[in-house]
Amino acid sequence: MKDILNCSLLAHNTFGIDARCSRFLEYASVEEAQQVALLLRDEGLPYIIVGEGSNLLLTKDYDGIVAHSAILGCKEVSVDGANADEVYVSYGSGVTWDDVVAESVSNGWHGAENLSLIPGEVGASAIQNIGAYGAEAKDLIYKVEAVEIATGKVVEFGVDECAYSYRQSRFKHEWKNKYLITHVTYRFSRHYSPDLDYGNIRQALAAKGVEGMPSPELLRQTIIEIRQAKLPDPKVMGNAGSFFMNPIVGRDVYERLAAQYEAMPHYVVDADHIKIPAGWM
């Protein structure tokens, strides 16, 4: 376990701001997460839990404790009742998210291709319900393992318990700062059925001369290129990535807008709600 006083947070925020915290605690195992949890509980100082810090804007030094996961690695796990088309893989919460996508594509585990190049770590995927180009983490998450800060006990939550919705979860609300996430198990598919109808994916593929179904590798590379064309590399120019949320409106509101703006892009969320891209607005 790392325990550093007056620690720089330069490596833990994508804006590249060299603010400092009073104390930095980093855990690399479940046992270390339990130690960190009890320290957070007993020290009586304010604390925050960070990943890569893409949702963090530090305007001054933080007078408190910053906790971070360095739990790495992954392993396939068996799940009762799983069908032959499914593969379940548990990742440490400190693994870089895009490494998960790259590994899944390389191994023929499908479903994460559209989530390529999203900044952050595995733990954050379960908190934020990260998403892009018609895909969300909740569509892949099977369960989340964590340590309860109040007790140091190891707990786990099935995907339904986390109450995921658009960029939301219980970890952002009633469970905020109550758990240190240690592992997330994702359910991938061995069957490749890509979603190409969101945003300008098809146009970008057509520009490459691809009219049919792209390979998973080509789809991932195309998503990466689309994202890189919109946003600078945070390692070169500090930024928070795409942090906004696209508005979701009722069908009645959508129909009024569509009557005014016939070319307005939109995506059906459910029978009563439509998502309108904020970038178009």
Give residue ranges: language-model regions:
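Phosphate/pyrophosphate- and phosphate-bearing ligand-binding catalytic cores of soluble enzymes
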Residues: 4-5, 11-19, 56, 154-281
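Anion-binding (especially nucleotide phosphate/pyrophosphate-binding) glycine-rich loop
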Residues: 1-140, 144, 148-150
